[in-house]
């Protein structure tokens, strides 16, 4: 780990393979090496720095890291330490504008005592984290929608099965005399109206009128001629 001081007074740290810093940092790395390696503390740029007055964030962009890693093998990105005041001003500027113009970038760099490139990289990292957070929220929302739609699909499938069962099964017809359901063998379908009715025997033949009824005098009495004629 090599340390350097920028013209603005900020300390820049850069990891170099095969070298380690002296003092307490070197002792900390040695202790960590005994446990499995020396790892730098990762900080969330969305949250203020905790436990200290400074915050670190990668200086280089993703493209730069890939180029340096391809040329010189494994590479650890450089870190820039920001104070709480600098982090607060950067967050306020990001809430106002997610993208800065060259003039805004230059003015903010002068105000924060940073280089314009450092401000640009910070905004790139901040936009990437915002996009990642938004993607996670959209993924969670789509998962909930998928679950509700799956449950609705199952409910509709159950309703379809119930309707099919009702369509196949014969309808229940009650007897007009006993009010009990008639068996399926006793049901017939009217060919004209296609309605299921209870099976009945042949139509009853009406008895002919009796002879007594035929011989009964008619209640109509014709008018007799008058005696005057």
Curated annotation (Swiss-Prot):
Keywords, in A-Z order: DNA-binding, Homeobox, Nucleus, Transcription, Transcription regulation
Alphabetical list of SUPFAM superfamilies matching this protein: Homeodomain-like
InterPro entries (UniProt xref): HD (IPR001356), HD-ZIP_Homeobox_LZ_Class_II (IPR050762), Homeobox_CS (IPR017970), Homeodomain-like_sf (IPR009057), Leu_zip_homeo (IPR003106)
Molecular function terms from GO: DNA-binding transcription factor activity, RNA polymerase II-specific; sequence-specific DNA binding
Extent of Acidic residues compositional bias: 52-68
Gene Ontology cellular component annotations, sorted alphabetically: nucleus
Superkingdom: Eukaryota
Pfam families, sorted: HALZ (PF02183), Homeodomain (PF00046)
Leucine-zipper: annotated segments: 133-177
Localisation per UniProt entry: Nucleus
KW Transcription (keyword) present: yes
Regions recorded as binding DNA: 75-134
Expression sites (tissue/organ): Expressed in seedlings, roots, leaves, nodes, internodes, flowers and embryo.
Keyword Transferase in record: no
Region (Disordered): 1-82, 198-229
Purpose: Probable transcription repressor that binds to the DNA sequence 5'-CAAT[GC]ATTG-3'.
Subunit structure: Homodimer. May form a heterodimer with HOX1, HOX2 or HOX7.
PANTHER family xrefs: HOMEOBOX-LEUCINE ZIPPER PROTEIN ATHB-17 (PTHR45714:SF8), HOMEOBOX-LEUCINE ZIPPER PROTEIN HAT14 (PTHR45714)
Family to which this protein belongs: Belongs to the HD-ZIP homeobox family. Class II subfamily.
Protein name (Swiss-Prot/TrEMBL): Homeobox-leucine zipper protein HOX3
Native organism taxonomy: Eukaryota, Viridiplantae, Streptophyta, Embryophyta, Tracheophyta
Gene (UniProt): HOX3
